[in-house]
Amino acid sequence: MSMILKISAESGFLYVVATGEFSLEEAKRTFIEMLEAVARNKLGKVLFDGRRLVGNPKFMERYYYGKFAGQTVAESTVRGVSPSTQFAYVLNVPMRDPERLGEKVALSRGMRVKVFDDLDSALGWLQVAPVNHLDAGDGT
């Protein structure tokens, strides 16, 4: 099963809902898809809701995803993605790593990213207002 993104441009941010089964290759593919939407919509904030993703990424997969994401954002400025774009990821365990390895690796490459366990905290960090139709993402 592949990862599927539902992307919508909201007032001031891009809202991305991801479903399916995690794999490193699929995560890289969908990250590029998300960056293309950022450039197309000229938005500087992304709310990535991955609470419906399934899988348990291995240590090195977390590292390689963080490295890929950080480098890809840095290299995407020529495609219209600002290096100051903020990315808030909302994930459940085991997709969300308590050690935040992927987040730390991406941060070390200049990406503005933070991982959360709830939507409200992510919206607060992005400093954007909630939108009524934002899905709970956790099946509730």
How does the language model describe each region?
Residues 2-140:
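Amphipathic, Lys/Arg-enriched alpha-helical "gate/interface" segment within cytosolic domains
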